Amino acid sequence: WLIKLGGNFNDVGFMGGATNKRCHRPTGGAAVGPEVVKTLYNAVEARKIDLRTDSQVVDLIVKNGAVAGVKVKDEDGKVYEINSKAVVNAAGGFAGNNAMVSKIIPRLKGFATTNHPGATGDGLLLSEKVKAAFVDMDQIQTHPTVVETTGVMVTEAVRGNGAVLINKEGKRFFDELNTRDAVSAAILKQTTGHAYMFFDDDVRKSLKAIEGYIKMPGMVIQGKDLDEVAKNMGVPAANLKATMAQYAKDQAAGKDSCCGRTKMERPLTKAPYYAILVTPAVHHTMGGVKINTKAEVINVDGKVIPGYFAAGEVTGGVHG
């Protein structure tokens, strides 16, 4: 559908937990999000759809038991109504609302998030008012590779294209392409609960998204060789050199003696070298309103709420 709208999603690569290349992304490995937004925005503009920014939906309008519009607060605080035949709730999840997240899973209290500030769960609260049913609210996913100080998520494609995870001791410790929950748990067990995403120049050149990280001040540690990058990372150079020598040997043999990784795209021997300090952060709230195969919202009695539809992360039982 996105490709039909003009989006560029022709590159297909590995992601965590995958046995085959099935994750679509822009040609050359550019970031997926901006391409999705650009594609949808262009489609909206071409169809002259009324797009209202700095506006907050504060309530649903219900007439004769059916959802028939919304009440909106504009940037000046004025509330007005939009009447419609139906309403589609695509307000996203609640990963940006740590109070809501930690109420459901206390151990995630204080965690950073990869999400934008608007991911506060407002769409769920609106749905609660019309007695919508909820499903899988306790299924909250962390992304394992996030820069703690900025909330910048380092795309899984970096690992998919060959990067490894190195701890503060200069050693690998887990299969980097395992599922997100497993990789997150493994990182949290390391010293300070952090790890370095480590890769060489071949990986850098394979993925346009990395260029964006390098342009971010202080995000990417670099070194002309393993000794220099180890010094800049603050890890034992001897350990890092031994780790990477073993990895290159394992990659050539096609068998990972350390961690059982089955997809080793590159030997990681092409200087210069790069590292990004990462830790897990709340990424994806998989629970939400219950819908049927027509995207109609179901209420607590198991019946369709007329005129009310939902799509995306605001829904539950669909993602993951």
What are these language model-derived features?
Residues 1-80, 97-100, 251-270:
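Conserved redox-cofactor binding core of oxidoreductases
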Residues 67, 172, 297-298:
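Hydrophobic "anchor" residues
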Residues 95-101, 206-208, 317-319:
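Short acidic/His/Gly/Ser-rich catalytic and metal-binding motifs that mark active-site loops
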Residues 21, 27, 114-117, 153-156, ...:
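Short Gly/Pro-enriched turn/cap motifs at secondary-structure boundaries
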Residues 124-126, 132-235:
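An anion/pyrophosphate-binding glycine-rich loop and adjacent beta-alpha core
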Residues 59, 239-318:
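A glycine-rich dinucleotide-binding beta-alpha-beta segment and adjacent secondary-structure elements
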Residues 75-147, 151-152:
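Glycine-rich loop(s) and the adjacent beta-strand/alpha-helix scaffold that form part
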Residues 1-16, 223-225, 231-240, 246:
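Rossmann-like flavin
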